[in-house]
């Protein structure tokens, strides 16, 4: 029970991390971001969750998809895993990075940019994510 979560919640979180980021060190940072957000009552904001909801339950693949799996609009974890996960994703949940990050964005260059404040996050989005963060962009799973 890392960070006081159940094994089922750890698996759910690992499944989100699996779909969000491929790099082990970034997975650990994203796990830390997610734990911090859960502790502070901030939605996870994981794009992989609304993409999953759209693929499985229908609806547009946008951040406004009205699904209980969409962590852009709902707090906490979704009701269950959104994919299979690797040992590295589960390792990230068990051993998250020790940082103060609260935000991250995957840039158009597929690099993850981590920040601590919303202002820094918005600046990173504006600088590194002009295509894939644009309104109307349809992400592919």
Question: At which residue positions do the language-model features occur?
Answer:
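Bacterial extracytoplasmic/cell-wall-associated proteins, especially those involved in peptidoglycan
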Residues: 1-141
């Amino acid at each position: 029970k890392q960070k006081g979560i159940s094994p089922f919640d750890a698996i759910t979180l690992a499944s989100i991390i699996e779909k969000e980021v491929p790099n082990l060190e970034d997975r650990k940072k994203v796990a830390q971001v997610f734990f911090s957000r859960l502790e502070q009552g901030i939605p996870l904001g994981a794009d992989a969750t609304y993409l999953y909801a759209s693929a499985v339950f229908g609806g547009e693949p946008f951040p406004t998809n009205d699904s209980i799996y969409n962590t852009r609009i709902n707090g906490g974890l979704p009701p269950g895993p959104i994919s299979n996960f690797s040992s590295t994703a589960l390792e990230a949940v068990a051993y998250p990075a020790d940082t103060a990050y609260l935000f991250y964005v995957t840039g158009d260059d597929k690099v993850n940019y981590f920040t601590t404040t919303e202002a820094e996050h918005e600046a990173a989005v504006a600088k590194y994510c002009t295509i894939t963060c644009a309104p109307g962009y349809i992400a592919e799973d």
